[in-house]
């Protein structure tokens, strides 16, 4: 009997198909009508992503007995991440619209690349095989290589794009070689049988091959997450890319990589090896300590948010080390809060961004007197990232510390608490600058797309800060 794709298969991958079709429509419009592209590409991008969200729910009952299940599996967790990625794509599209309104650049190809990146993210979240995971990561990465150098007149953009491409290409080799070693050891790359296959092998050589393969895959993911010492690309790339690209990398890439960690270490290899956990512990310690100390010295905001993002990656790795159901709930809640607050910060930067040099701390002096709303928005987002009560950021960090303490990882709890105190200093320092005496009375231009992102972030933070119980209940059900 020849396997064929059925209607059920197409419904189950509906979000992927819609994102792919949206990307093709955008590039066709850009190819044949540049004027039409300038007017409609952003709307088509947002519309396609929104339609994909509805398609997720349309495929809820259609993920069984699918021919694609060995490669792509839209289970409950995959649907959660898919919706998450699509919302991130909508936010990035709105910030890009605000950016192009200010800089008057051609942008049809930009939204095509953004859709391609979201396509890669969805593949990661729904991956049922290491090869699918690799394809998703590389689809995302290749799109970002081009997006980072999208502003052709910005020399710094070219430099950051080339650096990211060069280092990312090397890491892709590590990922693929790691997958090859795993296949050589156990004869499969399917995530659902990795652990059982590993436990059946008896030869020391095969165990070494398997362990080496997992180590190389983890190294590749650590690079994508910008964990210390694999972080060196991140500050330069964040500083050199445009504001919407940096926002998408800080949120989309981070969530995508941790979706890959979830698939690998929560589902395929839960509590894989005690010695391997010690290696990841070391990465967490190094990331938390180094990133927070270096962030103290930054004066350019995009570079500052690069180190802030590295620091948060360290916190996000704590639940990965623990690897149980409650840790998964803590991880997903932290990811959501981090994404909302980061988008809010970049919505403010969309108002302040003037050129390729980006926004410096000095540009924030007296922002409250120029725009009380923007200063308040940035303040609440920074307080959330710092984890200061009563914001949702405090709840997210508390949840992570709670599961770490219950699992006996006292060292991670102590280092996490100390670095949280340190990070509070540099976040509060920025807030102090916002409310200082103004050195510039120039009015800021209004941007509807950035205002939508900022207002949505503000409302979401307020709701999750004071009424998080329903959302936490959903995440608890998700992890079970």
Curated annotation (Swiss-Prot):
Subcellular localization: Cell inner membrane
Molecular function per GO: NADH dehydrogenase (ubiquinone) activity; NADH:ubiquinone reductase (non-electrogenic) activity; quinone binding
GO BP of this protein: ATP synthesis coupled electron transport
Superkingdom of the source species: Bacteria
Catalysis performed (reactions): a quinone + NADH + 5 H(+)(in) = a quinol + NAD(+) + 4 H(+)(out)
InterPro entries (alphabetical): NADH-Q_OxRdtase_suN/2, ND/Mrp_TM
Family, as annotated: Belongs to the complex I subunit 2 family.
Database matches in HAMAP family: NDH1_NuoN_1
Subunit structure: NDH-1 is composed of 14 different subunits. Subunits NuoA, H, J, K, L, M, N constitute the membrane sector of the complex.
Record function comment: NDH-1 shuttles electrons from NADH, via FMN and iron-sulfur (Fe-S) centers, to quinones in the respiratory chain. The immediate electron acceptor for the enzyme in this species is believed to be ubiquinone. Couples the redox reaction to proton translocation (for every two electrons transferred, four hydrogen ions are translocated across the cytoplasmic membrane), and thus conserves the redox energy in a proton gradient.
NCBIfam families given in the database record: NDH_I_N
Protein name: NADH-quinone oxidoreductase subunit N
């Amino acid at each position: 009997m020849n396997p064929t794709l059925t209607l059920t298969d197409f419904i189950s991958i509906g979000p992927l198909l819609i994102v792919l079709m949206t990307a093709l429509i955008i590039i066709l419009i850009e190819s044949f009508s540049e004027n039409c592209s300038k007017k409609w590409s952003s709307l088509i991008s947002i519309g396609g992503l929104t339609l994909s969200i509805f398609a997720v729910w349309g495929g809820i009952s259609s993920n069984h007995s699918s021919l694609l299940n060995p490669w792509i599996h839209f289970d409950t967790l995959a649907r959660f991440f898919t919706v998450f990625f699509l919302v991130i794509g909508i936010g990035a599209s709105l910030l890009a619209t605000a950016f192009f309104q200010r800089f008057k650049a051609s942008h049809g190809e930009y939204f095509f690349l953004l859709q391609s990146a979201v396509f890669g993210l969805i593949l990661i979240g729904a991956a049922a095989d290491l090869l699918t995971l690799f394809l998703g990561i590389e689809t995302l990465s290749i799109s970002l290589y081009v997006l980072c150098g999208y502003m052709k007149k910005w020399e710094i953009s070219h430099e950051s794009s080339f650096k990211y491409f060069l280092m990312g290409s090397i890491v892709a080799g590590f990922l693929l070689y790691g997958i090859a070693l795993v296949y050589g050891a156990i004869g499969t790359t399917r995530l659902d049988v990795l652990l059982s296959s590993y436990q059946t092998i008896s030869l020391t050589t095969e165990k070494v091959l398997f362990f080496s393969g997992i180590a190389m895959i983890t190294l590749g993911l650590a690079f994508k997450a910008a964990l210390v010492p694999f972080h060196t690309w991140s500050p330069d790339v964040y500083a050199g890319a445009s504001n919407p690209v940096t926002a998408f990398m800080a949120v989309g890439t981070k969530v995508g990589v941790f979706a890959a960690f979830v698939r690998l270490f929560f589902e395929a290899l839960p509590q894989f090896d005690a010695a391997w956990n010690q290696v990841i512990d070391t990465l967490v310690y190094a990331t938390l300590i180094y990133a927070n100390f270096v962030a103290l010295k930054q004066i350019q905001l995009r570079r500052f948010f690069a180190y802030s993002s590295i620091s948060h990656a360290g916190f996000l790795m704590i639940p990965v080390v623990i690897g149980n159901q409650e840790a998964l709930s803590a991880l997903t809640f932290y990811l959501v809060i981090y994404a909302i607050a980061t988008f809010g910060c970049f919505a403010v930067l969309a108002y302040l961004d003037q050129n390729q040099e980006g926004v410096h701390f000095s540009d924030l002096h007296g922002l409250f007197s120029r725009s009380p709303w923007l200063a308040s928005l940035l303040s609440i987002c920074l307080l959330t990232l710092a984890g200061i009560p009563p914001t949702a950021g405090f709840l997210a960090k508390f949840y992570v510390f709670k599961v770490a303490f219950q699992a006996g990882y006292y060292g991670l709890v102590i280092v996490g608490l100390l670095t949280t105190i340190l990070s509070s200093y540099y976040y509060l320092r920025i807030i102090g600058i916002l409310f200082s005496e103004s050195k510039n009375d120039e009015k800021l231009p209004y941007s509807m797309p950035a205002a939508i992102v900022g207002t949505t972030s503000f409302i979401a933070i307020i709701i999750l800060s004071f009424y998080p119980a329903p959302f936490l209940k959903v995440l608890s059900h998700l992890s079970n």
